[in-house]
UniProtKB/Swiss-Prot annotation:
It comes from Phenylobacterium zucineum (strain HLK1). GO terms for cellular component: cytosol. Transmembrane segments: none annotated. This is Diaminopimelate epimerase. The active site is at C77, C222. It is an enzyme of class 5 (isomerase). It catalyses: (2S,6S)-2,6-diaminopimelate = meso-2,6-diaminopimelate. Coiled coil: none annotated. HAMAP family: DAP_epimerase. Keywords: Amino-acid biosynthesis, Cytoplasm, Isomerase, Lysine biosynthesis.
């Protein structure tokens, strides 16, 4: 792994959704898909859900790139953005960090001790913005994606810079996430594949959520998934404009503001540091 050899990294997590974070100021970082998979491998590598590169940027605090554990570069990662935002604010001493991503510009702000809010921007709700392979109503998708009693109600589709489909289920703990997730992820309706959420509305301001993450599998938390589920539920009238999202790794607070922007608030943590092999 010569392109990465000896490069320092930080291992971070947001509610157990974990990342290997490298900064590229000292040397370019262009890992191959095989190198990403080797770093992410929990048996033989460092182990992570996503690899993150923090690049210098004109007019922003950083440009950030994300790779899923399968080696594919992706446009957005909510928990990862929150962790990078915390790092940038610690470095600058400021209470705000402007972050450029492939999916657009995001702004992180301090929300408390190791708590960070990220303005994820407005959700994309048109079928061709998700994207879907053909026109459908993204509020309630009229397609059976997986045959299971709990998954027959029409799911919602939202893009938060990456594609999500959200099923509303009677019991998130019993939802067939590990079985249905990989089958739906690669469904031909989703040309870029899709993240799959299983959401149980517990109260008008509380949702229990499990997420099968595209290219990573079941994760303890998915920030963009939490945003997508909250928006999908609000569009259906199941909740209002804000909710506490209960994920396997803990809680995120998500608000869909009147100006259309989605704000996600949650913790960021540093686990350890080291050097890439």
């Amino acid at each position: 792994m010569s392109a990465a050899m000896g490069r320092p990294f930080l291992k971070m997590n947001g509610l157990g959704n974990d990342f290997v974070v490298v900064e590229t100021r000292s040397a370019p970082f262009e890992p191959t898909a095989a190198q990403v998979r080797a770093i992410a491998d929990r048996a033989t590598g460092i182990g992570c859900d996503q690899l993150i590169a923090v690049d210098p940027a004109e007019g922003a605090d950083a440009h950030v790139r994300f790779w899923n554990a399968d080696g594919e570069e992706v446009g957005a990662c909510g928990n990862g953005t929150r962790c990078v935002g915390w790092l940038l604010m610690q470095s600058s001493g400021k209470d705000e960090a402007v972050i450029e991503t492939r999916a657009g510009r995001l702004v992180a702000t301090r929300a408390g001790e190791r708590l960070v809010s990220v303005d994820m921007g407005p959700p994309r709700l048109e079928w061709n913005e998700i994207p879907l392979a053909e026109p459908h109503d993204t509020r309630a998708l009229d397609v059976v994606l997986y045959h299971h009693a709990d998954l027959m109600a029409p799911p919602g589709c939202v893009s938060m810079g990456n594609p999500h489909v959200v099923f509303f289920v009677p019991d998130a703990e019993q939802a067939p996430a590990a079985e249905a997730g990989p089958a739906i992820e690669g469904h031909p309706l989703f040309p870029e594949h899709v993240n799959v959420g299983f959401a149980q509305v517990k109260a008008p301001d509380r949702i229990r959520l499990r997420v099968w993450e595209r290219g990573a599998g079941l994760t303890k938390a998915c920030g963009t998934g939490a945003c997508a589920a909250m928006v999908a539920a609000s569009r259906r009238g199941l909740i209002g404009r804000h909710a506490t999202m209960e994920l396997d790794g803990g809680e995120l607070f998500v608000e869909w503001r009147a100006d259309g922007h989605v704000i996600m608030t949650g913790p960021a943590a540093v686990d350890f540091q080291g050097e890439l092999p």
